[in-house]
Amino acid sequence: MSLLRRWFDPIRSSWFYQKPSRQAVLPTEHGLSVYLRLDDVYSYLAVQQLPQLEDILADELKPLTVVISRQSGDAPNQMSAAEWQNYCIQDAQILAKQHRFSFHDSPEPPTAEALMQAEAILRHTPLRGQDFLYLLEDVFHMLWQKQSGKLRTLYAMASRHHQIQDFPERVFDDAPVLASYFEFGGRKYHAVDDLLRLTRRLKQQKLLTDNPIFLINHIEWREHLISDAEELNEIQALDPELDLYIALEDPISWLLLAYIKEELAAYYNIHLNVYPLSYHGRDWFDWSLATRLSKRTDVAFTPFCRPTEQATYQMAQLYYSAPEEQRVDAMYRILQAVWTRGQDLSFKAHFERMQRELELDQLTTADVTELLKENDMLCEMKSQPDFPVLELRIDGQSYVFNSLYRVWMIESIFSNVLEEKYKSENETETESVAQAHEQ
C-alpha cells in the first residue's frame, strides 16, 4: 500500500467525518427535476408521488420539471439487460407492497407500440402543472397495468385534437436514464430510495409548504418493526439464517455487517454467514455518501485506511484462519480495525497486531484466492446489481436482495412471515370449526 494512503487516509477521513456534512444551502436556480423512462418500473413508482410532491413545493421550485428519456443506461455489475429488467420488476414489487404503491400482480414491460402511444399522449397534451402530473400518472398506470384499450383511446384523442406542445418544464430527450431519479442543486437522488433524503433537504431549506408524507411504511434505522414478545419469540424459533457477500475494500460492507450484528442478529436470533469477495476496486468510493450512511445507521466510522487489493487478501487470510464458529466475529473485528482505527492490514506490523488480537496461532494453509473466487461465483449467481448481497432464509423460503438500502427488508420479511403464519392458522381453525358443525 502507498505510504501516503497509510499515513493520510486516517487523518483525512477523521477530518472529513467531523466537518459539516451538508453545505448550508443548495442552489435553487435550476429548480427540481425528475428524470423518467416510460419503460422503467421505478419511474412508475415515482410518478405516483409527484402530484403530492409538487403540491407542497415552494413557488420558487415550481413547476416541477419532468424529463422523459427514451434511452436506458448500461445495466450495473455486468448484468445482462434481461437480468436487470427482471431484477427491477421484482424489486419494484417489493417496494410497492411495502409502501402501498399501485402495482400489477404480474407486471410486464410495455410494448414498443404502447410506449410510442404514451409518449405521443404526453407530447400532445396541453395540460400543465398538477393536471399534467395526474395525466402522467394515469399514462404510467395504463402502461404497467396492461390497460392497452384505454391507452389506444387516449392516444387517438390526443393525436386527433391537439398539436405537439412545447413547454419548458416538459422535456423529451435521449440522455440515458437507468432508473428514475430527482436532481436538485446539482445532486441526484434515487426516485424511491432517496425520496425521504430529498424531502428532508427541501424541508431544511424551507422549500416545502407542508410536512411531506411519503413512504409511510419506511422503517427507520435502530427502530424494530417487531417488538411484541410473543411475535419476537416466534421469529427467533424459526432460526433465520442470513448470508452476506461483501467486498472487503467497500466501507458499506463494514456499515452493513456492523449494523446487522449489533442491532438485528441477537435480537432476532439470526445466524450469520459471511462470504468475503475478491477485490472489486470499491476503495474508490464516495466519502460523503459513506459518512452520511454511517451517521444515519449510527455505526462507528473513521479513521479508516482504504484497503488495497493486497490488503483485502490479507484480511481474507485472517478471516479464514479463524475457527469456523468464530469467523463472523473475526470479520467484524477485522473490518472494525480497518474502518474505525485506520489499520492497514497489508502492513506487516498492523497485520501481526490483528493476528494477535484474534488469537490466531497460525494462518490457514488453504488457497485463499480460490476461496474468494468461489464466493465470487456464488455471489454472481444471485444476479444482484450492487454489493453487499444478502440472502435471507426463513420458514423454508429464501429471499435475495442487496445493499444498505434494502436492510429494512429483513424485518419486513419477518413481519410478512408472521402475517402468513397467522393467516394460515386462522384458515385452519375456521375449517376445523366448519367441519365440526357439519358433523
Give the positions of each predicted feature.
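N-terminal glycine-rich phosphate/pyrophosphate-binding loop and immediately adjacent elements
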Residues: 23
